[in-house]
Amino acid sequence: MLQHSRFLLSALLLMSLAGTVTAQDSAYHPVLSDNFIFSAGAFRSDNTLKIRAEGTLGIGDNVDFGESVGVDRSNTLAYVQLRWKFGSERKWSLTGQYFANDATGDATLKEDVEWQNIVFREGTFVDGGVKFEVARLFLGRSFVKNEQHDFGAGLGIHNLDLSAYIGGEIMINDDTTGYRRENASASQLLPNLGAWYNFSPASRWLLHGRLDWISADLGKVDGTLWNTNVGVNFQAWRHVGFDLSYQYFNLDFVVDKGDWRGGADITYSGPVISVTVNW
């Protein structure tokens, strides 16, 4: 018991000293002045996965993979981000962000589903899955930058990889023709505009927000993208902090590319808990 008490007292003393060092270094959050900020954590996402694959027939409605096919509507994703500030007065920055989702499920269909020239009939047992990867690279410049504030804007690019499938027995006149699985996939680079604002009310606290947006017709792909994050960061030690934020990502597009003619309306949203390291 005495050893536990000593350990707790030592830990409290260490945190107190760490807080003193942070306060002495700057009156405001060190993320605003340091060159590198790395964060890694968990993104607890609620997912809306509505995808359409018309095939060569040019028919088909959006399939809600969560409601119709039983694909997970919520799961925990790995979330990583790195920002590097450089140039005169460190007003330029390069930011990378990555998260991915690989969700599967199965269900007995409550209604007919059309997918890639195939109609899976009501009452058929099907399995399905959606895999989605987002890699973001953003180059920005701060227009208002001091110890307490950082406001900037810039240009970025999102590399998006999306694939989906549905598999099940094909019924013709109450007879099965066997199991069929049909896939749809596409990859696309989407440029975007973006802006951010960071505000430090005190040495340990940072409020931050970011928004990316694009609406464009790129020939084979026509759609709109929103990617935003707002949150708060607590600096526990000089180079380590803890971050709680809310992430919202939405992609709504139509595509006529490769083996996929159709579209999708995909949303990932929810809290992100991460550890930040700055230097």
Give names to the regions the model predicted:
Residues 24-29, 81-88, 140-145, 199-203, ...:
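Outer-membrane beta-barrel proteins
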Residues 38-44, 96-100, 141, 153-159, ...:
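Transmembrane beta-barrel strands of outer-membrane/channel proteins
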Residues 40-42, 80-84, 137-141, 155-157, ...:
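Residues on the lipid-exposed face of transmembrane beta-strands in outer-membrane beta-barrel proteins
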